[in-house]
Regions:
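Short C-terminal tail/terminal secondary-structure segment
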Residues: 146, 233, 244-260
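Residue(s) in the substrate-gating loop at a strand-loop-helix junction
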Residues: 141
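Active-site helix of classical SDR
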Residues: 121, 157, 165
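Substrate-binding pocket helix/loop in short-chain dehydrogenase/reductase
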Residues: 97-98, 105-110, 213
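Short, small/polar-rich loop/turn modules that mediate ligand/substrate recognition or access, typified
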Residues: 87, 173, 178, 243-245
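Canonical Rossmann dinucleotide-binding motif of NAD(H)/NADP(H)-dependent dehydrogenases/reductases
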Residues: 3-35
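Alpha-helical segment proximal to the catalytic Tyr-Lys
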Residues: 126, 170-174, 241
Length: 260
């Protein structure tokens, strides 16, 4: 559960590693009190150590569990008079095709990557609405537009997040709640490093594999979590007040480059 909070600007971020942790750090530096939610005890502990407890809290939460999210939102409602930002970032990326993705795999990736965004947005909406000028940022992906092989479940959820964001934005604008999505390309995260390790030949160099990933991008490198966090900072801030229902690519020109 969340402990007592005394802050004028509050944000909830789902996920406790990689991009989510960088977003939390950036929002803390912007003056937010950040509640970071994750279901991996090791990642939660590392995030707690990284952020400290003065301007952030890390809460154990499975965003795909409707009852747990409802309890979390109710508890938060007793401690806050409003929520300024919700950043839905938690995600998993299992590998599989239509043949190899099992029903259990499908339910898990949809539960975390899509249903989790709905549950957090649904149960926290009263707190967002009460602010009158809150912002929601949903993490999609370039793979919501164009796809690699063998990522059926992940790509499906990321494409759905684009439609989810547009629909939510249209409905919520009347309440002063702005909703946008972010679509990163290859970003240096634990998830990307895991993928790179699986593709690095025995005796090969992980960094060389990551450099190869970068060559697909017009800029010639992978992105950093801090670069993504800077975009989120803009989208939850007052300067982006006319941004509603958009998808903001941060992909180093990946989709602009024709790799032939």
């Amino acid at each position: 559960m969340v402990s007592d909070i005394k802050s004028t600007r509050n944000a909830v971020v789902t996920g406790t590693a990689g991009i989510a942790l960088a977003v939390a750090r950036r929002l803390v530096s912007d003056g937010f009190f950040v509640i970071l939610c994750g279901n991996d005890p090791e990642q939660n502990a590392a995030a707690r150590s990284s952020l400290g407890d003065q301007h952030a809290q890390v809460v154990e939460l499975d965003v795909s569990d409707a009852d747990a999210v409802e309890r979390f939102a109710a508890d938060l409602g007793h401690r806050l008079d409003g929520l300024d930002a919700l950043v839905n970032c938690a995600a998993i990326q299992p590998y599989g095709t239509i043949e190899t993705t099992t029903p259990a795999d499908w339910q898990k990736v949809v539960g975390i990557n899509l249903t989790g965004y709905y549950l957090m947005s649904h149960f926290l909406y009263p707190l967002l609405k009460s602010r009158g000028n809150a912002s929601v940022v949903n993490f999609a992906s370039v793979q919501g537009h164009l796809n690699q092989n063998n990522v059926l479940g992940y790509a499906t959820t990321k494409g759905a997040i684009h439609a989810f964001t547009r629909a939510m934005a249209v409905d919520c604008a009347k309440d002063g709640v702005r909703v946008n999505s972010v679509s990163p390309g290859s970003i240096r995260t634990p998830l990307l490093e895991f993928a790179a390790r699986s593709l690095t030949p025995e005796g090969g160099n992980l960094e060389d594999t990551i450099k190869e990933f970068g060559k697909s991008h017009s800029i010639g490198r992978v992105g950093t979590t801090e670069e993504v966090a800077a975009l989120v900072s803009y989208l939850v801030g007052p300067e982006s007040g006319f941004c509603i229902g958009g998808d903001f690519p941060i992909d180093g020109g990946l989709r602009a480059k024709l790799n032939v």
